[in-house]
């Protein structure tokens, strides 16, 4: 019983303990532990794989929005940074990441573009717990995932396979 209570809010205990520890020089920290900086981004795209990359490109090129990507894959981040994209290294399923992320009030949209539904669910929970109150969009592979996302406050939930089918038909 006690462990169930502790596990449910364990991150709060960790935060309280961490607040009492001395500050660390960021250069000495593991890159995943450093503060991310979204700068003046209006949109944060979480997961910079194929779907996230496409969303990032469309949001910047077509809609002229300021976007920051988030990913945990170091080589992918380096490749995207070399292409001129702003990508933050971090684990979006970790509440610590969201609490450490430097973001201005300009961030008003979060796009959950990770391939696993469970990761998007956890990232959504962390995003909400960190105080984010903007719009959330999410990709999903299955209709039940789209339904779950909508039931949990995701304003735009999109089935990637349905979208691919529509685009394919438009190209024929």
Label each region the model flagged:
Residues 1-172:
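Cytosolic regulatory regions of ion transport systems
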């Amino acid at each position: 019983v006690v462990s169930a209570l502790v596990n449910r809010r364990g991150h709060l205990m960790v935060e309280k303990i961490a607040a009492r520890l001395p500050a660390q020089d960021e250069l000495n920290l593991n890159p995943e532990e450093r503060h991310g900086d979204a700068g003046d981004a209006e949109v944060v795209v979480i997961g910079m794989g194929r779907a996230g990359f496409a969303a990032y490109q469309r949001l910047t090129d077509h809609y002229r929005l300021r976007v920051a990507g988030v990913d945990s894959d170091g080589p992918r981040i380096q490749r995207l940074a070399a292409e001129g994209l702003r990508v933050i290294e971090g684990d979006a399923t970790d509440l610590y990441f969201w609490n450490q992320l430097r973001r201005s009030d300009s961030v008003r949209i979060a796009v959950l573009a990770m391939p696993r539904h469970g990761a998007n669910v956890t990232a959504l929970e962390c995003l909400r717990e960190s105080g984010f109150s903007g719009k959330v969009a999410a990709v999903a592979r299955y209709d039940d995932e789209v339904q779950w996302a909508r039931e949990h406050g995701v304003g735009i939930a999109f089935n990637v396979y349905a979208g691919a089918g529509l685009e394919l038909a438009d190209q024929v």
